[in-house]
Amino acid sequence: MATKLNVNIRTLLANCEELAKSEQNFWRLQKFIKSLDTMLAELEAMGDPQSVKRIPGYLERLQALKISTGYADVPGSTTKTPSQSSAVSETGENALKEIRQLQNSKYHNELRKELLQDSDALRRRRGADESSSSSGSANVQETSGENMNQAAKYYTNAQEKITEHMLSLTRNLKEQTETANRIIRRDTEVVSRSAGMADRNINSLGKEAEKLEQHSKKAYKCWLWLMIAFVIATFIGMVLFMKIMKKKKS
């Protein structure tokens, strides 16, 4: 209960201080200040330790409000009956609701004034624009038509350039593909010719090797027959020489 009452007092004090900035609201603040007196008296009667520390600050702010608005205390007893004490919170809440309604109505009035001022300025500006646009509407239409034509030409030229660029890229790609195919075919032919030549060389080398073997075998046989003939001739010569020498001695 004390916490809620503290919150209501702080909120009501802040709203009253905001309203006290304008002298036109002084007459409205009388009953709110009276409600604050009642709420502070109820808070003192509760005897809450935390609330007791805050009460002097509340009283200072309330006294400043009274001085600034010229509030006059109504004479009467400050003692409260139990029924009056139970109605303090309702009185504070009603005062808060009324202050909020006042603030909302004030904000609504200010917003309405701003909107009315903006609408008047818009009407004046629209009249000036209509007077100026009526004289230059033909020029605007002509310039807009020229701008549209220029934009269409620009986009047409851009599309043509893009198309030409794509065609040139396609031609270059086709030429490069054909060149690569020719190079690949030429390299394939060279490789196939080289493979054929290698096969032929291997075959010829095999044949030459066979011929060399045959020649070497023939040469070996010739030398062998020559050696045999030489040995036989030498043997015959020795026999003849020995017979001739015997005849001479005899």
From Swiss-Prot:
Residue numbers on the Lumenal membrane side: 243-250
Cytoplasmic side residue ranges read: 1-221
Q: Can you tell me where the transmembrane regions are?
A: 222-242
Listed A to Z, the keywords are: Coiled coil, Endoplasmic reticulum, ER-Golgi transport, Membrane, Protein transport, Transmembrane, Transmembrane helix, Transport
Q: Which domain of life is it from?
A: Eukaryota
What is one GO biological process annotated to this record?
retrograde vesicle-mediated transport, Golgi to endoplasmic reticulum
Region annotation Disordered: residue ranges?
72-92, 117-147
GO: which molecular function terms?
SNAP receptor activity
Q: Which Pfam families match?
A: Use1 (PF09753)
Mode of membrane association = Single-pass type IV membrane protein
Q: Where in the cell is it found?
A: Endoplasmic reticulum membrane
Q: Which GO terms describe its cellular component?
A: cytoplasmic side of endoplasmic reticulum membrane; endomembrane system; endoplasmic reticulum; SNARE complex
Instruction: Identify the CDD domains for this entry.
Output: SNARE_USE1 (cd15860)
Q: What does this protein do?
A: SNARE that may be involved in targeting and fusion of Golgi-derived retrograde transport vesicles with the ER. Required for protein secretion.
Member of which family?
Answer: Belongs to the USE1 family.
User: In its UniProt entry, what is this protein called?
Assistant: Vesicle transport protein USE1
Q: What is the species listed in this Swiss-Prot or TrEMBL entry?
A: Drosophila melanogaster (Fruit fly)
The record's gene field reads Use1
